[in-house]
Amino acid sequence: MTYQATNEAADADGAEWVPWREATERALYGPRGFYRRPEGPAGHFRTSVHASPLYAAAVARLLTETAEGLPARVSEVALVDVGAGRGELLTGVLAALPDGFPVRAYAVERAARPAGLDPRIEWGERPPSGVSGLLFANEWLDNVPVDVAETDDAGVRRYVLVRADGEERLGGPVAGADAAWLDRWWPTAGPGARAEIGRPRDEAWAAAVAGLESGLAVAVDYAHRAGDRPPFGTLTGFSGGREVRPVPDGGCDITAHVALDACAGPGAELVSQRDALRRLGISGARPPLALASSDPAAYVRALASAGEAAELTARGGLGDFTWLFQPVPAG
């Protein structure tokens, strides 16, 4: 345990009080956890991967661009999808790549390999090491469990403890590495203010990136930066396509926005999804009206594609996600 509770660890009726990080780990990844369910994330919410095949096409283009900058000795280009869900993104990228492109695809996911998945996709719980290419993590870091801190009336930051029914109370003071992280990345805003302690995410990201010998690592998530942290945190739940109260009983996703600036290493760049996809040729621009006369079928296809691109880049929606580009120079 990284805390000392101000009360007993369990109520008289046996209800256990634990920090949010521990509760989330059980609720998402335990034997009956939310992410162990057969339907997977797609059964409860829609990510950019599910919104349009254009997203996979953009990642395929990013992979080919990354491959051009790899050392000549690299004969096989790795594509590592961290938090792969049921393999939807990798399946789409493999379909979008040019014929004969020398890719080796890795899905990193704690759930079991789905039946019928493309046999070219290797499945495991940990990122590979010693590979060169593109590591891509779409909405992974927000599901790396973190502890929650709340400032009490005396100005002391304390761990928030939670029961399986979602009820909360304050525990012991935040100390050690967690306190240092808050001091550096999310200073207190006064009594009642809350913060998610992102240190485990920083460490998870650094460990994933360390597996690349050369190439590019990209994390995509809803995020915030220093100077723009939400005063009461962002911890929430999702189930059946709706935002719900976060209850760590395995019945809903539990997530919180990511302090991506804290994850960023030397040479990293943070850009909006809108700008990132535009760099990769996804803009949402409507096709010229003249095409409707010269080639009506092509115009209809282009119009549909523009609509999908507009959703991926929309302000106030998916376009506001943040992309962290972390280059990994060859050693």
What is the predicted role of each segment?
Residues 124-126, 141-156, 197-207:
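A short, conserved alpha-helix within the catalytic core of class I
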Residues 179-331:
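Long, Lys/Arg- and hydrophobic-enriched amphipathic alpha-helices
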Residues 134-186, 232-240:
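A mobile, often basic/glycine-rich helix-loop segment
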Residues 80, 108, 135-138, 220:
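Active-site flanking residues adjacent to catalytic metal/cofactor-binding acidic residues
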Residues 132-133, 215:
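Conserved acidic residues
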Residues 1-126, 131, 149, 275, ...:
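Rossmann-like AdoMet
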Residues 36, 144-146, 228:
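Short helix/loop capping segments that flank catalytic or ligand/cofactor-binding pockets
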Residues 85-88, 142, 224-225:
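Gly/Ser/Thr-rich loops at beta-strand to alpha-helix junctions
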